[in-house]
Swiss-Prot record:
Known cofactor(s): pyridoxal 5'-phosphate
Pathway(s) annotated for this protein in UniProt: Amino-acid biosynthesis; L-histidine biosynthesis; L-histidine from 5-phospho-alpha-D-ribose 1-diphosphate: step 7/9
Substrates-to-products reaction catalysed: L-histidinol phosphate + 2-oxoglutarate = 3-(imidazol-4-yl)-2-oxopropyl phosphate + L-glutamate
Record's protein name: Histidinol-phosphate aminotransferase
InterPro entries on file: Aminotransferase_I/II_large, HisP_aminotrans, PyrdxlP-dep_Trfase, PyrdxlP-dep_Trfase_major, PyrdxlP-dep_Trfase_small
Domain of life the protein comes from: Bacteria
Pfam families: Aminotran_1_2
Key words of the record: Amino-acid biosynthesis, Aminotransferase, Histidine biosynthesis, Pyridoxal phosphate, Transferase
Enzyme class: transferase
CDD domains noted in UniProt: AAT_like
GO molecular function: histidinol-phosphate transaminase activity; pyridoxal phosphate binding
One biological process term in Gene Ontology: L-histidine biosynthetic process
UniProt entry tagged with the keyword Protease: no
């Protein structure tokens, strides 16, 4: 990109803010030696009576070791939706700026656009679920602040071609957000290792998918020091609670079990794909780098209701662009997948 300057993108009112600073930050190293009577907490120690570390230092340090990215390039949030919302609030002027999204894609980009009163310019993926570069560049205006790329994409499951992503990063002078919620199920490399090459790059990940902790709500954002510093100005002081910080550290110190689970899910994905090919009302199975499969069936609404009657909840995506008569199926355990295939076979014979 030419002459990229993050200070030209940030909202003026945000540029003048200072990040929240806890009065205790300067006493961190002294810890137990100090008597803390500053924050009106309950003084009786139960392990959770104190406010959590607002900078989540221990989690960032371990995550840095795991992902190979400096702690200074990491921001944590209450789920990925919070860090995505922070990007809107830091860089987009309500009623003036616009963002570009590529349907079919993750629905929260549009929701956050609407909440923040930002125009959402939708550019459909092509029929291979790949970005249409010509159409994207035609939609860019002087007020386009962000392009959102979900890769691996939800609901299609495919990873976008690296060459196309790189071209967007190089030609667009705004921010490019790559949502990698499903990256651990893919053989593609994460874009976090290209942060130094592209100052306009933001990558988001989550603990909800491969790490199996949707219940703790922890989202991760990786970007340049400058972008992280701007987002820290508007981040709520204690946005990641102590229980979440403790649980996330347990996960990061036990990644071998996570890797085994991911390998099992990928193996089940392959098995399930082959079995679904044999079902007569399944017309197409899309290639997936995620923990789900998008399949095309004869009548999605009918099949969705039939699975509900059998006690199996899947996702009907047929109301999304390019997804007519498509169902999205999460890869379950071996036992759950067997029940799913059994239901498919029963419906096939009805």
């Amino acid at each position: 990109m030419k002459d990229f300057n993050i200070n030209k993108l940030v909202r003026p009112n945000v540029a003048g803010l200072k990040p929240y600073s806890s009065a205790r930050d300067e006493f961190k190293t002294q810890g137990a030696e100090m008597v803390f009577l500053d924050a009106n907490e309950n003084p009786n120690d139960n392990g959770l009576n104190r406010y959590p570390d607002p900078q989540q230092t221990s989690v960032k340090e371990k995550l840095s070791e795991t992902r190979g990215v400096s702690p200074n390039n990491i921001l944590l949030g209450n789920g990925s939706d919070e860090v995505l919302d922070l990007i809107f609030r830091a860089f987009c002027e309500p009623g003036k700026d616009n963002v570009i999204t590529l349907p079919p894609t993750y629905g929260m980009y549009k929701v956050l656009s609407d909440i923040n009163n930002i125009e959402n310019r939708e550019v459909l993926l092509n029929h291979d679920f790949e970005p249409d570069l010509t159409a994207i560049f035609k939609q860019i205006t002087k007020d386009t602040k962000i392009i959102f790329l979900c890769s691996p994409n939800n609901p299609s499951g495919n990873s976008f071609e690296a060459e196309k992503i790189e071209m967007i990063l190089e030609k667009f002078n705004g921010l490019v957000v790559i949502d990698e919620a499903y990256i651990d199920f893919s053989d593609s490399k994460s874009w976090i290792h290209r942060l130094e090459d592209f100052p306009n790059l933001i990558v988001t990940q989550t603990f909800s998918k491969a790490f199996g902790r949707a219940g703790i709500r922890l989202g991760v954002l990786y970007s340049s020091d400058e972008i992280i510093a701007i987002l820290n100005k508007i981040k709520p002081p204690y946005n990641v609670n102590q229980l979440t910080q403790k649980e996330s550290l347990k996960i990061l110190f036990n990644l071998d079990s996570i890797k085994l689970q991911v390998a099992e899910i990928k193996n089940e994905r392959t098995i399930l794909s082959k079995q679904l090919l044999e079902v007569n009302f399944v017309s197409k199975i899309y290639r997936s780098d995620a923990n789900f499969l998008l399949i095309e069936v004869d009548h999605a609404n009918k099949r969705y209701d039939q699975f509900l009657e059998k006690g199996i909840v899947i996702r009907n995506r047929s109301n999304q662009p390019l997804c007519e008569n498509c169902l999205r199926i999460t890869i379950g355990t071996k036992e759950e997948n067997k029940k799913l295939i059994k239901a498919f076979k029963e419906l096939e014979n009805e």
